[in-house]
Amino acid sequence: MIPTMTSAGWAPGVVQFREYQRRWLRGDVLAGLTVAAYLIPQAMAYATVAGLPPAAGLWASIAPLAIYALLGSSRQLSIGPESATALMTAAVLAPMAAGDLRRYAVLAATLGLLVGLICLLAGTARLGFLASLLSRPVLVGYMAGIALVMISSQLGTITGTSVEGNEFFSEVHSFATSVTRVHWPTFVLAMSVLALLTMLTRWAPRAPGPIIAVLAATMLVAVMSLDAKGIAIVGRIPSGLPTPGVPPVSVEDLRALIIPAAGIAIVTFTDGVLTARAFAARRGQEVNANAELRAVGACNIAAGLTHGFPVSSSSSRTALADVVGGRTQLYSLIALGLVVIVMVFASGLLAMFPIAALGALVVYAALRLIDLSEFRRLARFRRSELMLALATTAAVLGLGVFYGVLAAVALSILELLRRVAHPHDSVLGFVPGIAGMHDIDDYPQAKRVPGLVVYRYDAPLCFANAEDFRRRALTVVDQDPGQVEWFVLNAESNVEVDLTALDALDQLRTELLRRGIVFAMARVKQDLRESLRAASLLDKIGEDHIFMTLPTAVQAFRRR
């Protein structure tokens, strides 16, 4: 039976407003004011990272703030322009637009639409489990790579030099060759903004650091007429709100953007769900991954229709809202109202923002993406996890942002296959004073039952590990110190099987039979029993050699 979707299922955000409590209002208002002060300069900065005019960042912020408040399942998550998606947008569109700014803007909006459609369709199809497609080590390494690419993309902006190239190493090389032509007033201004942001984060973490730093830089430029001395400013920003419309794009461009859009959708959704779950857990709340897919999809469609670019969750804005007391998505609606007011009535002030200050804001955000504590945690946990994270970082730097995403997904899948293809296994024995049977490697005092091998393979059986299972099971028999008479497979971990695995199981049974060893199975659940029957293995093994528990299997061996 296909489950029906209720209105709360499609719009889970409505529930928080139905259950709204007056005592939450102060925190939500404060969070809305703070996030708006953070969002406005950040959105403008990320628009420049995406290769678009600063105004596009504000356009891309408006509709997603309203839509996510209704459709999202997280009460804390902040949606809008974000560093990774902005950088991926630039990586995808720069080669396609070839310097045509109008075409670039059309492609950016189209990319947002495609990302949204992919997420929306995936959410409708209940593919929320894809949130686990990127493992933690891969995500940590990917974000570190993104951060380094973000910094390299801003080298020209914060130094006033001309930096060529669209990838990390080409940008670093170009900057190295032009470092003698640094425009020192621009560089000093950028470093001052970066220093102020760092100090505010340390000494006043609840303060809206970005807006304070950028406004301070703007006042300095205006008072000292620094724009006349070579410091670039944003320039004219259209006042008012964007007029929604479908971008005029060709079928050829749509085809070219489909695969990049899928890559951006994966990163957007995965990062968003991980962030939402982390903050929801602090308050004992739950996040619906399928609802998140639909919400992020709708937000990106709206961003595309309002001449923006792909949007995602922002962990920094989410954390800021949480720390100042935000309890529901009302804070996003308040932030939305402030963004609209600024766009309508204060576009002249935005025009005076120094480009170098926005670049410093991007560098500051990038530095916060490099989580050294997570790298240290990976190193302490398992060396292979650390190497996986470093390999992902190297893939992003060497292959570029988009192909780095594909490499990240591939590395996650390969790591999963490696674990499935060669999982832990164990021979079980009895431990004095402890009920049940346990791994003899974990308990040196464990005693085997002479003539009986009880074997457990700790993974679902499938094509990826079928041969590994058969080979290791026979190795256990060969290494047994006594004469093996029975082999009992503890199937508690083997509920999921495919035909390749059952063929390997039958080959194992046949080989053991040839050696005069009885093959039996214990802890066989009903689903596995049905699979054995469908593959005609149940009769071959024999109902009298299929046991519900390990003790009954051992008793049967002793009564043989």
Swiss-Prot record:
Alphabetical list of InterPro entries matching this protein: SLC26A/SulP_dom (IPR011547), SLC26A/SulP_fam (IPR001902), STAS_dom (IPR002645), STAS_dom_sf (IPR036513)
UniProt cross-references to Gene3D superfamilies, sorted A to Z: STAS domain (3.30.750.24)
Transmembrane segments: 29-49, 51-71, 79-99, 105-125, 138-158, 184-204, 207-227, 256-276, 333-353, 355-375, 394-414
Subcellular location: Cell membrane
STAS domain span: 442-557
UniProt cross-references to SUPFAM superfamilies, sorted A to Z: SpoIIaa-like
Any Gene Ontology biological process: transmembrane transport
Recorded topology in the membrane: Multi-pass membrane protein
One GO location term (cellular component): plasma membrane
Keyword set, alphabetical order: Cell membrane, Membrane, Sulfate transport, Transmembrane, Transmembrane helix, Transport
Family of the protein in this entry: Belongs to the SLC26A/SulP transporter (TC 2.A.53) family.
This protein's name: Probable sulfate transporter MT1781
Organism: Mycobacterium tuberculosis (strain CDC 1551 / Oshkosh)
